[in-house]
Amino acid sequence: MKEIVHEKIQNLDLKEYLINFIDEKNHFSFGILSFKHYVALSGNRSSHILTLAGGIELLILAFDIFDDLEDEDNIEIKWMKIDPSLALNAATTLYTLGLETICSISNSAEFHRLTLKYALNAMQGQHEDLRNSPETEEECIQMMKQKAGSLTAMSAVLAAMLANGEFNQTIEDYAYKIGIIKQLENDYYGLVNDQRSDIRKKRKTLIYLFLNRKFNEASEKILKLINSHTSYHSFISDSSKFDELLFEAGLNQYVSMLIKLYEEEITASMNQLNINIKL
């Protein structure tokens, strides 16, 4: 990622910001997902997949910055500590660099079309999230599929196309589910992270919609705490007590069941294609 920035960016001040932001990354799960698919499908040009993975991770970093700026999240991270206009310009630069890098790997019009489709769909999913639009669990899952699933689909599908030159619908379908799992895990983490704005802004995540069905007293208690920002953050400081309440509400079981269901569907689809990837 840094090599791409050093090669493409001449403005030294902007370059320094981008390198510092890249240093903030501590996971590269989207690039790894691409790499695993490329290897599983017998791709043999390491320079191609490394370039793809780097381009995708630049794009993911851009989306992370956009997301934090829009949600006012993670206030201790580097891009949230500078002038928002500079952070926004840096994110736009990373977004453009990511797309340019990805599209430079292949001359295929279909490869380019899919790259832009997934990026555009992810932004539309983010718009629905910012609008707090979902009213039902089905609508929320569709939003998660667009917002997060589009990026996991990009990672897996483009790697497969690099390996064998073909678009595979089955890979796209299960890759969307990988993204839904990632988003669900992220939303669950948002329950206990006081750096996140999910609670303060009452985001209609799948978790919130489940609680809002008020199956039991524990669900209602959590909702009341959510409506009292100070009480909520005081309560979650006692993690064992909060975990117990989540369990009583049935939330832990609900999230675990959904993840297990999607994982089983993903594994079944991979087995059909003789793809052996550990997620």
UniProtKB/Swiss-Prot annotation:
Optimum pH is 8.0-9.5. Changing S234K: No change in ComX production or secretion. Signal peptide: none annotated. It catalyses: L-tryptophyl-[protein] + (2E)-geranyl diphosphate = (2S,3R)-3-geranyl-2,3-dihydro-2,N(alpha)-cyclo-L-tryptophyl-[protein] + diphosphate. Mg(2+) 2 binds at D67, D71. Its cofactor is Mg(2+). It comes from the Bacteria. Its EC number is 2.5.1.-. One of its GO terms (biological process) is isoprenoid biosynthetic process. Mg(2+) 1 binds at D67, D71. InterPro entries: ComQ, Isoprenoid_synthase_dom_sf, Polyprenyl_synt. CDD domains: Trans_IPPS (cd00867). Its main location: membrane. It is an enzyme of class 2 (transferase). Optimum temperature is 37 degrees Celsius. GO terms for cellular component: plasma membrane. This is Tryptophan prenyltransferase ComQ. It comes from Bacillus spizizenii.
